[in-house]
């Protein structure tokens, strides 16, 4: 249990005690100190508890474990271990180009002012579909919209390997087109092999444990 969860439990306990005290001794609110106590216990602390809970949930929901907790996501998690460099998620995950504990969120958030919250709002929709909707087959799951190069360039822009890659200079203006989002990084016959869960039955897989020996 981390510090945020402990603080949340402490807040809830304090709110409960103060609320019971206010209900048991309503005459306390007749005095100025009692009114302050009631305001803190019934208004300030609940808001702080809600904020702490929301912060804790937001942090947990960015974890790879959370994203893959739905059964329909199992094949997407499996695709991170495909032993093929052309699989973009696998290459990034296996080489620590993205933090493994937050791999899904790192690539699927929007790198804008409120991008994290938009990503979480989409996550709420996923949860609703998981429990109340019709769950699609893994191979039928698609992005809501075309993947924006902004998300790729958040990490790759300015990197020497990106700037000097021969494949990025097949045309003289490729980097400029990618920067302006006119040429998609993950389509246009470039990095177009992403999760490809429909092909996993024919794939070979990398084992971190085997390579650690």
Task: Tell what function each PLM region has.
Residues 1-213:
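Short sequence/structural segments immediately N-terminal
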